Amino acid sequence: MTETAQQIVMDLVKAELSQFRPAQIEKVLKLLEEGNTVPFIARYRKEATGSLDEVEIREIEERHQYATNLYKRKEEVIRIIEEQGKLTPKLKADIERAEKMQRVEDLYRPYKQKRRTKAAIAREKGLAPFAEWLMNGPTSGSLSVEAKAKEFLNEEMELSTIEDVLAGAHEIIAEIVSDEPAYREHIREFTRKNGQVVSTVKDAESDEKGVFEMYYDFSQGVATAVPHRILAMNRGEKTGILKVAIAVDEEKIFAYLSKKVLKNPNSIAAPYVKAACEDSYRRFIGPAIERELRNELTEAADAQAIDVFGDNLRNLLLQPPLKGKVVLGLDPAYRTGCKLAIVDATGKVLAKSVIYPHKPANQEKRAAAGPAFRKMLQDYKVEMVAIGNGTASRESELFVSEQIKQVLNTVYYAIVNEAGASVYSASDIAREEFPDFQVEERSAVSIARRLQDSLAELVKIDPKSVGVGQYQHDVSQKQLGERLDFVVETAVNQVGVNLNTASAPLLQHVAGLNKTIANNIVTFREENGAFDSRQQLKKVPRLGPKAFEQSVGFMRIAGGKNILDNTDIHPESYPAAKEVLALAGLSLKDIGTEQAREALGALDRTKAREATGLGKETLQDIIAGLTKPGRDPRDDIAQPLLRQDVLSMEDLKPGMELQGTVRNVVDFGAFVDIGVKQDGMVHISKLSNRFVKHPSDVVAVGDIVTVWVDHVDTNKGRVALTMLPQK
């Protein structure tokens, strides 16, 4: 692109993103163009961007991409129309002023290479002058419409009757009306503002469970459509159960078109022109606008569902690690038995087994399950049991709660979201890690490790398989995949990784690295022993200067040669960090001590900035790194809810106060695990006394919340909860 083109695109982005300062947008785009990654810019270039976070930087990147595509499309459309010899200064100016792709396409429509339409055939037969005469509004003093039509009769052109002539003119007028950008724009906005999305039942018999019952006779305004309802209606339509359409007051649209197209409403041609306008709307404009608006609604609903999925995944990835604990992972099942795997504090597998505590196993196997389970708890000094939340989860929870009461050591258990564990256990990564394990045994290991470090384990799985969202299989899979990859990348880099223990799947999400370099780091570690300096990364094959610059700050080395390597301070700032220490009367050996915390806390920040030349944000980050080396931001989050006993549905009574873990957040509320068979549902109206726009404003996946039982339906296995304090 030329400099002029780049400036036009830049101006469009600035106009679109008025919440950012122009200088911020320019700096972000320059940093991205130089090959810097989003996490690196967010963490280490705060002065340049004004402390924009990853989401804001990505928004600028995406809007710039859209503006670039828009500019290129405008150039292409102008070129095509110019080649046709039909480009006027006004049309060119209109195209150049367009801020949306839809507007460009509306302006281009009349000049598109069309298939041979009925209107085109009518023009070939010479009927354009007659159509123009009709639209000009002849009065009663003129020839009658029929008399004028007779002038165009032509056997050779297959215009044998007046009806043939009128039909041809009708097609021409209908196409002219359809191709006029201003008409489409007005009707689109009118429908967007006043239209209703209507769903009716098409095949109730196929809806055996009545999933779509509320949509059998349902309507909502296009302008106020609720995203999750749009996705539900789309799904019902896709399965053939519902018929979905957009309804609007057509009479007002017909009146608008007649007024615009008819130069003389009292003309003798008025009935013919009105009929052509109505036909143009019904055949061309209406269906096209319905498609556009339904696509628009679906895209908005997709974006909302993807946002919810992304937020839920982020909160799941950032669950606080349970450090230094020996954990037994239990993958529950009935017929095939519960698979057990014990991992030590580093995640290394110590033992694995299978027990059969549930029917249909015979009495002998069920009786043997308890002693075998307790022996494993005692032999390996297990402190925590992680139970997968899939099939047989609640029965397994009851079994575990009974067993841990009978052992001498104190053991707790937690229910772990096992979504995607089966996907992981059958993957190449799992086979490589545990070649001699059965699929279910790998799942048990994954469940145990999820409790120890959710992030390190979940990065091994396609994020779409984690299953915390709504309608994730109905939305654009490309957009969902891109968003979730971004969420994973952001989470990994916000937390950072231990260079000497991180797996290749975890390392490949570090800024600047890819799958090949991640594997090379692991191979280098295996061949040369643990890293004791970040500088050693320069010896890793394929890890060049740019990859080193982008990634090194996100990788930590505990117990290395330089304690700064165990902080999130970038090596480029090591000299400045040492200056800060000297100003506080400290040295490297003092990092992380109480003395350092006090001295750095009392440091005059203004003088420190003047002495070091550091910006406010970078100085702040350096002081934080020197105060708490090896800090894990997840440590500030509440630990998982640990239990020793179990509840049944029958134990629940309205008004009962409980603590639970938020398992999923959707548009209409949140699902909370309260330790009974079925997760309870807190409706959006029961989340807070204040107005709640979206449940994610109040709760997040993994939150520990206090809830009260609202009502229980034991027949349907449903528990309604409230977070509104009870009197």
Summary of predicted features, one role per range:
Residues 8-9, 68-86, 96, 432-530, ...:
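Long, highly charged, low-complexity intrinsically disordered interaction regions
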Residues 53-59, 66, 70-329, 333-436, ...:
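Duplex nucleic acid-engaging cores and interfaces of nucleic-acid transaction enzymes
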Residues 44-46, 249, 332, 345-346, ...:
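Short, ordered loop/turn segments at secondary-structure junctions
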Residues 560-561, 565-727:
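Single-stranded RNA-binding regions, centering on S1/OB-family and related RNA-binding modules
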Residues 94, 107-108, 236-251, 260-285, ...:
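Structured, non-catalytic alpha/beta "coupling" segments that mediate domain-domain communication
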Residues 189-196, 330-334, 390-395, 416-423, ...:
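A glycine-rich phosphate-binding loop feature that marks nucleotide/adenosyl-phosphate handling sites
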Residues 1-26, 33:
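Generic start-of-chain signal for non-secretory N-termini
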